[in-house]
């Protein structure tokens, strides 16, 4: 793509491992001797992929922007002291993505966590996660964009917190008052067109 098209960046979604049980024990036995566990080996595989892409892409185009949109919860505090005060699927332990390591190494230009939950949602509060990710990038040169779950508003029924534009407006107001956030990304733009009032909200 980079060799043949004048693109500004390359963006990856989050699913590097499937998040379900699968058998790679034979491969681990063959290649994982330097690791204490299969989990560490899997995370290193993903880290190696990200670092390799970063190096290759910037060799082809030093001005290109490379980033990833990981699942919104790196890890829950209950399983990892560096994690967020949440209770959801852990990218670190279930998808084997160590996005904090990518930030530490600088192997991404930006990170765009998928924060597809409402403000005040008990298991994964939007504001709690925004603040966690702000801290995660605070001592790095990695730009932070927040992924917003516009699809939830498109699918919501009357009475749901996501119905209409109110929740998205609350989230945008919170982000506007936050530092170290370069912008937001909607999943998906097509969803916005299905939410009454969204076009007017975005151009206001």
State where each predicted segment sits.
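A conditional alpha-helix N-cap/helix-loop micro-motif detector
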Residues: 46, 92, 126, 164-165
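Substrate-binding cleft of secreted/luminal carbohydrate-active enzymes
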Residues: 96-122, 133-204
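Polysaccharide-binding and catalytic clefts of secreted carbohydrate-active enzymes
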Residues: 1-107, 116-117
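Short, surface-exposed, charged/polar-biased interaction segments
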Residues: 22, 78, 123-124, 129-132, ...
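P-loop/Walker A phosphate-binding loop and immediately adjacent motor/lid segment at beta-alpha junctions
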Residues: 38-66, 71, 122-154, 204
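Short, glycine/charged-enriched secondary-structure capping and boundary segments
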Residues: 25-26, 81-83, 126-128, 199-201
């Amino acid at each position: 793509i980079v060799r043949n098209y004048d693109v500004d960046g390359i963006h990856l979604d989050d699913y590097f491992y499937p998040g379900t049980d699968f058998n790679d024990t034979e491969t681990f036995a063959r290649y994982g001797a330097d690791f204490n566990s299969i989990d560490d080996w899997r995370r290193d595989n993903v880290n190696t992929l990200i670092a390799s892409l970063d190096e290759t892409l910037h060799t082809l185009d030093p001005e290109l922007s490379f980033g990833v949109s990981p699942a919104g919860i790196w890890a829950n505090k209950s399983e990892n002291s560096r994690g967020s005060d949440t209770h959801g699927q852990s990218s670190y332990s279930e998808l084997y993505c160590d996005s904090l390591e990518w930030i530490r190494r600088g192997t991404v230009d930006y990170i765009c966590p998928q924060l597809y939950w409402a403000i005040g949602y008990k298991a994964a509060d939007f504001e709690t996660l925004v603040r966690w990710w702000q801290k995660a990038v605070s001592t790095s040169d990695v730009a932070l964009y927040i992924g917003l779950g516009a699809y939830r508003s498109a699918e919501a029924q009357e009475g749901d917190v996501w119905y209409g534009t109110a929740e998205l407006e609350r989230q945008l107001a919170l982000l506007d008052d936050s530092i170290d956030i370069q912008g937001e990304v909607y999943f998906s733009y097509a969803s916005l067109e299905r939410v009454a009032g969204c076009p007017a909200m975005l151009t206001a």
